[in-house]
């Protein structure tokens, strides 16, 4: 009788694996795009801001990194002057586990102000160089910015978040040619896409 019971248990377990197939990820992944634009800023030819990281906070979980658009780069630099008047560029984009997210966190590593304009090309890149001018380093007391805005990432769907980096309110001249930055960034919109129908 005992041997029959053991056999029955083994048979039931084996049958459940056969019916269920291989284990699958119950949550899946979706894609998060983080785009950047800038309010008008008129006191410079170029304002290069370098980001060290973009992260999203998942409910009841931890911070998840959002890859930069250039996935091989550890930083991403954007010229705020090229992001004025409705222009946008991708800051980060990549797959994240599905679920409800509560916050976006940005880390601004450095910033420089130039009188000359940056060369032709995209507003954001892994690096941007302006030849013939050293630029003015901007002091950043705290480069970490947390943005509270909930959104839900669905499986096989894309959610796009558009951020406004207000350069005019972020940068202040304190005298003697010294500039400081306290990043003022707001979420303009969160646009989810509909996942494909089976």
Model-predicted regions and their roles:
Residues 15-18:
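C-terminal motif of bacterial Sec signal peptides marking the signal peptidase cleavage site
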Residues 1-8:
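Bacterial N-terminal signal peptides that target proteins for export
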Residues 20-198:
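A short, solvent-exposed, low-complexity linear motif enriched for acidic/polar residues
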